[in-house]
Structure formats: structure tokens, C-alpha cells
Curated annotation (Swiss-Prot):
Key word Cell cycle present: yes
Family annotation (InterPro entries): Glycosyl_transferase_4, PNAcMuramoyl-5peptid_Trfase, PNAcMuramoyl-5peptid_Trfase_CS
Protein name: Phospho-N-acetylmuramoyl-pentapeptide-transferase
Class of enzymatic activity (EC top level): transferase
Annotated pathway: Cell wall biogenesis; peptidoglycan biosynthesis
Keywords in alphabetical order: Cell cycle, Cell division, Cell membrane, Cell shape, Cell wall biogenesis/degradation, Magnesium, Membrane, Metal-binding, Peptidoglycan synthesis, Transferase, Transmembrane, Transmembrane helix
Region forming the signal peptide: none
Organism, scientific name: Limosilactobacillus reuteri (strain DSM 20016) (Lactobacillus reuteri)
Reaction it catalyzes: UDP-N-acetyl-alpha-D-muramoyl-L-alanyl-gamma-D-glutamyl-L-lysyl-D-alanyl-D-alanine + di-trans,octa-cis-undecaprenyl phosphate = Mur2Ac(oyl-L-Ala-gamma-D-Glu-L-Lys-D-Ala-D-Ala)-di-trans,octa-cis-undecaprenyl diphosphate + UMP
Similarity field: Belongs to the glycosyltransferase 4 family. MraY subfamily.
One Gene Ontology MF term: phospho-N-acetylmuramoyl-pentapeptide-transferase activity
Keyword Metal-binding listed: yes
């Protein structure tokens, strides 16, 4: 992995997504198929009904194509790369299935929660098996704990795929946060590029940054297209996989602090309502609470991006200093 291949990776994934996205938007508009809006959501979100979704279809395609040709050129086609591509594509397909039900059946809910959870768990199990023979290390230690860590991997990937999915409720929020998150892991990988598997991880992060940069102009407010579950599930699972393969699992709790807070707000809201009959927030995930408090989408986006950026800087700096 050198400077030229890094630049071409970002440029390739960016251009494929940026140049082809208008055609995908035009296709979905012609089909009159778009996002269905939750009835219990903010009333002003109703105007977003019909906005094309499944933008993840193109930015995942762009990332995969770019990763494969650069990896073939640089001799980086390894098990590490296949593991990352597996997570990206399979979780994307799970989301695509869910999005298709919503779009073509004109409903906001996709397939049943247990069906989605089962697919996510099975995919995470396959990822675990792929790397089982190499052994695992905890992010802040060297103790190998076998099957117990395997369960942790499944929980980590499924958990963060859903956390990013919950966060994807405002125009541009997740695409902006994800660029920051992948950039943080790119820096960690580049600093340790001599470590086995790190060049492949760097390539993966570069491609994801490029493709999301190409997607962002069409996704920020007012969004011309949403990434859909296809995009958000794939991004969340991929970030979890990257953190695992870098052996800095716990760093995702900091780098992905916004995803964690969004998920925690939902859990706390449900727990509070079930036990006391009272709600802690006006609406969850928490970005809706701020909407209901009078914040504009742009204000929420910018504040959340800044929180994500500061958290990423803290996490990366700590890892580089402490190791």
C-alpha cells in the first residue's frame, strides 16, 4: 500500500458513487418507489415520504469494485480482506431485503425483527469462523479466551450494525459520522502498516471513505436519496469488523459514541416506560428528542458530527500514545 494506491482508492470509490448516484435516484423516482415515513415520527418528516432509498446499493458496489481492483494490483487479496468484504456485502444484502419489503409493499417496517436478528447473527457467526483459526486478542490485552470471545464478536457486530441503523434518522447524519469513524481507523491502520492485515484494513477504510464522500452530496439535507437499511447495517457491521481486526475493539465505544448514545437512549426510554410509565426523552432515538426540542436537522447533524470528531481524535490519540 503506497501513496498512489491510496489516492486512487479514494478517487475511484468517490467517482463511481458520485457519478452514478444521479442515475440511481432517477431510476427510483421513475418507479415512484421511495421511503415510507413512520407515523409515530416527527410530523414534519412526512414531507420526506417518497424520497428514494437504498443508496447503499451503489456505495457498497463502488467500494467493493474499488477494493478488489486495488487489492489485485497491490497483492492484498487475503483472508482479512475477504472477511471485511463478507461483512460489508452480506449485511448490505440483509438490509437490501428489508428495504425491498418496505419499498415494494409501501410500509415503514420491513421483515420481522426475529428474521433480521437471525440473519445478522448467522452472518456474524460466519465472520467469527473465518478468523477462528488465527486466534483472537482482546483490544487492551493479550489474553485469548476462545469461544467466549466468539460470542463477543457476534454481539459486537450485530450490536453496532443495529446501532448505526438506529442513528440513520436524519439527512446526512450517518454518512457524515461514518466518514469520521472510518478515517479514525484508517489512521490507526496506517501508523501500524507493517502489521499483518493492516494494509488490507487501510485499503478497506480508504474505499469506504471515498464512497461515502461520493454519497454525501446526495444525502445531506435536503436528502435526494437515503442509504436505507442496506447502507446503515453494512456500515455498522463493517466498523465493528474493522475494530475487531485491528484488535482495538473497545475503541469503537468512543469513536462510535454517537451510535452508542442513540442506542442507549432507546434502551433507557423503553426501560423507563415499562417500569414507571414515564418517558425520559420526548422521542427516541435521541436525535428525535432534539428535533422535538426545536433543533433543526442541520444543527443536530453538525453537533453530532463534532461530537463524533472530538471522540475520534481522543480515541486515536490515546491508541497512538498508549498502544
Amino acid at each position: 500500500m503506497n501513496f498512489l494506491s491510496a489516492v486512487l482508492t479514494i478517487l475511484s470509490s468517490f467517482l463511481i458513487t458520485f457519478l452514478l448516484m444521479p442515475s440511481l435516484i432517477k431510476y427510483f423516482r421513475a418507479k415512484k418507489e421511495g421511503q415510507q415515513i413512520r407515523k409515530e415520527g416527527p410530523t414534519w418528516h412526512a414531507k420526506k415520504a417518497g424520497t428514494p432509498t437504498m443508496g447503499g446499493l451503489l456505495f457498497i458496489f463502488s467500494a467493493v469494485v474499488t477494493i478488489l481492483w486495488v487489492a489485485a494490483w497491490q497483492g492484498l487479496i487475503t483472508n482479512t480482506l475477504w472477511a471485511l468484504l463478507f461483512v460489508l456485502v452480506v449485511y448490505g444484502l440483509i438490509g437490501m431485503w428489508d428495504d425491498s419489503i418496505k419499498i415494494f409493499h409501501h410500509q415503514n417496517e420491513g421483515f420481522k425483527p426475529w428474521q433480521k436478528a437471525l440473519c445478522q447473527v448467522l452472518a456474524a457467526m460466519v465472520f467469527t469462523v473465518i478468523y477462528q483459526h488465527e486466534g483472537f486478542q482482546m483490544g487492551f490485552g493479550t489474553t485469548q479466551i476462545g469461544w467466549l470471545y466468539g460470542l463477543f464478536i457476534i454481539f459486537w457486530i450485530v450490536g453496532f450494525s443495529n446501532a448505526v441503523n438506529l442513528t440513520d434518522g436524519l439527512d446526512g447524519l450517518v454518512s457524515g459520522l461514518s466518514i469520521i469513524s472510518f478515517a479514525a481507523y484508517l489512521i490507526i491502520a496506517l501508523v501500524n502498516l507493517n502489521q499483518p492485515g493492516y494494509p488490507e484494513i487501510a485499503l478497506f477504510c480508504l474505499a469506504m471513505i471515498g464512497t461515502l464522500l461520493g454519497f454525501f452530496p446526495y444525502n445531506h439535507k435536503p436528502a435526494k436519496i437515503f442509504m436505507g437499511d442496506m447502507g446503515s447495517l453494512a456500515i455498522g457491521a463493517s466498523l465493528a469488523a474493522v475494530s475487531l481486526l485491528l484488535h482495538h475493539e473497545w475503541s469503537l465505544l468512543v469513536i462510535g459514541i454517537v451510535y452508542v448514545c442513540e442506542t442507549a437512549s432507546v434502551i433507557l426510554q423503553v426501560a423507563s416506560f415499562k417500569t414507571t410509565g414515564k418517558r425520559i426523552f420526548k422521542m427516541t432515538p435521541i436525535h428525535h428528542h432534539f428535533e422535538m426540542s426545536g433543533w433543526s436537522e442541520w444543527k443536530i447533524d453538525i453537533v453530532f458530527w463534532l461530537v463524533g470528531l472530538v471522540a475520534a481524535i481522543i480515541a486515536v490519540t490515546t491508541i497512538l500514545l498508549v498502544g
